[in-house]
Amino acid sequence: MNGAIGGDLLLNFPDMSVLERQRAHLKYLNPTFDSPLAGFFADSSMITGGEMDSYLSTAGLNLPMMYGETTVEGDSRLSISPETTLGTGNFKKRKFDTETKDCNEKKKKMTMNRDDLVEEGEEEKSKITEQNNGSTKSIKKMKHKAKKEENNFSNDSSKVTKELEKTDYIHVRARRGQATDSHSIAERVRREKISERMKFLQDLVPGCDKITGKAGMLDEIINYVQSLQRQIEFLSMKLAIVNPRPDFDMDDIFAKEVASTPMTVVPSPEMVLSGYSHEMVHSGYSSEMVNSGYLHVNPMQQVNTSSDPLSCFNNGEAPSMWDSHVQNLYGNLGV
């Protein structure tokens, strides 16, 4: 504590040189050197003399080298003039001035940047507000258009309903693209015809009146028709057994007779009539009488081909053929 107080007093002493002040400051920072230097600081002549320098050199302290200073002309004493002290002070002032200028410039730049950021933020806000206003306007336009379309659609639908109310007939559901008045009328007529035919079939088929539904009615009608077919087949078989008849192939018999007879040209009725009329014209009859209805000629009297194939039944072989056919029928029936 005593060393620190002494250092403060020495620093505040007005007649001290710069070196003395530096040494006192060193003493203040390193109080361990208080005891050996107390005698030297007690006498000011020793401080100004060379004993202090020699003692510091023996102690291993070289203050001028520590503070970056040099001696003048090899003298052990330090030569520090007031001009050098003033130069260092001016340098510090200049450095402080430059630092203050840099700080001011930085502050100005910061303020400018802040102003720019504020302006950019305001511009962005204005753009966003403009976009929002534009979007709101577009939304309003879309809503207005939608309202107009709804009104138009409602008007069209009201017109369509009025037109439908004017029609007297019942509209029938049709396919896409065919929902017209003519189509609906034709469909109604077709269904009416179908319903009439179904009623007629119900009257024909016994027990079909009790069935409800078109599918059931159709099934019942089909079953009834099938039963009728079976009954007809059974009755035809009974008739064939009771009244047997020869089963001849008339086409084969006629072909055989034609093949056996010689090829002769049979004049057609038209040829006969044309030749007869020609002869009558030459004999003195007028053409009007020939073409008129005075002549009544039956062409079937001249050419009779329908009775010729049946001439085979007049032979004596007919009963034997009948007996053989009857026996074949009985054999097939298992009698």
Swiss-Prot record:
Induction remarks: Accumulates strongly in response to blue light due to reduced preventing 26S proteasome-mediated degradation in an ADO1/ZTL and ADO2/LKP2 dependent manner, but levels decrease in the absence of blue light via 26S proteasome degradation (at protein level).
GO process annotations (BP): DNA-templated transcription; flower development; negative regulation of innate immune response; positive regulation of flower development; response to blue light
Biotech exploitation of the protein: The blue light-mediated interaction between CRY2 and BHLH63/CIB1 is used to design an optogenetic control of target proteins or organelles.
Subunit record text: Homodimer. Interacts with IBH1. Binds reversibly to CRY2 after blue light illumination.
InterPro entries named in the record: bHLH_dom (IPR011598), bHLH_ZIP_TF (IPR024097), HLH_DNA-bd_sf (IPR036638)
Name of one Pfam family that matches: HLH
Main function: Transcription factor that binds DNA to G box 5'-CACGTG-3' and, to a lower extent, to E-box 5'-CANNTG-3' in vitro. Binds to chromatin DNA of the FT gene and promotes its expression, and thus triggers flowering in response to blue light.
Organism: Arabidopsis thaliana
Renumbered residue ranges of the record's region Disordered: 110-160
Protein name as it appears in the record: Transcription factor bHLH63
Primary gene name: BHLH63
Tissue-specificity statement: Expressed constitutively in roots, leaves, and stems.
